[in-house]
Design a protein with these regions (language model features):
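N-terminal, intrinsically disordered, polar/charged segments of Gram-positive cell-envelope systems
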Residues: 19-46, 52-54, 69, 77
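Sec-dependent N-terminal signal peptides
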Residues: 1-9
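Short coil/turn connectors at secondary-structure junctions
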Residues: 53-54, 88, 116-118, 219-222
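Phosphate/pyrophosphate-binding betaalpha-module
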Residues: 209-224
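A short, Trp-centered hydrophobic/proline-enriched beta-strand micro-motif
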Residues: 55-59
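Enzymes and membrane/adaptor proteins characterized by extended Gly/Ser/Thr/Asp/Glu-rich
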Residues: 62-66, 72, 82-209
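C-terminal motif of bacterial Sec signal peptides marking the signal peptidase cleavage site
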Residues: 13-16
Length: 224
């Protein structure tokens, strides 16, 4: 979590703000583990206990303002107040909070602006039945089949492209975390909870697919 916090801080601080910068953009892949650990410790030294505890939690949009509908698609003043009082580590958005590209980007931006500490802005975009963004035609996001279908028919090149494309398109909407892919190996065909959300029954094959997807999403600055 400490290193992840550093990456989010760097992502937000190096994001464009409409002005040219004379500072060279720092790439996280250029930093080794020891450097990241040191940066993380420096950041957390300046954080209060309340803020540190808050970083352990990811909340839904509805939990930030329970007076509003769970289908909320805009940031309310209460949401901003809640984030200020309870500095959560991240916010997850579901399909009911995602309507159009402009609306989604505005919402993720306003939530980030309302938080003292940069947020993990998360979504579930696995492909197939769990596609919070691509399932909405108005979002015009590239749709992918189920993990089962990907594992059965995609080669390494297509899998890498899938990770890159998902990462790029999610980043454009203001997300920096994808709660995917599912790493479960399908060991029980009667497990309907996982079902076609798994890439297959072979653990090595599943591990290779997961690794490829995650690496390519991370290249787009999406935590996965």
């Amino acid at each position: 979590r400490l290193i992840s916090l550093v990456l989010v801080l760097m992502l937000v601080m190096t994001a464009g703000c409409g002005k040219k910068s004379t500072t060279k953009k720092l790439k996280t892949e250029d930093l080794d583990e020891t450097t990241l650990q040191g940066m993380a410790k420096d950041i957390t030294k300046e954080m209060s206990l309340k803020n540190k505890i808050g970083q352990l939690f990811m909340v839904s949009v509805y939990q930030l303002d329970e007076a509003e509908s769970k289908n909320q698609t805009s940031v309310t003043s209460q949401m901003k107040k809640t984030l200020k009082k309870y500095p959560a580590g991240g916010v997850i958005m579901f399909a009911k909070n995602i309507n159009t590209p402009d609306q989604t980007k505005k919402m993720t931006d306003e939530l980030q602006d309302a938080s003292y500490i940069p947020l993990f802005m998360a979504v579930d975009e696995e492909g197939g039945q769990v596609s919070r963004v691509a399932s909405n035609p108005k979002m015009k996001m590239t749709a992918y089949p189920s993990a089962q279908e990907v594992g059965r028919t995609y080669n390494d090149k297509k899998i890498a492209q899938m990770g890159k494309t998902q990462g790029k398109e999610l980043k454009e909407l203001g997300f920096n975390m994808n709660l995917a892919p599912v790493a479960d190996v399908l060991t029980n065909k009667n497990n309907t909870e996982i079902g076609d959300r798994s890439f297959g029954t072979d653990s090595k094959k599943v591990a290779n697919i997961i690794t490829t997807l995650v690496k390519n999403m991370q290249k787009q600055q999406i935590s996965a």
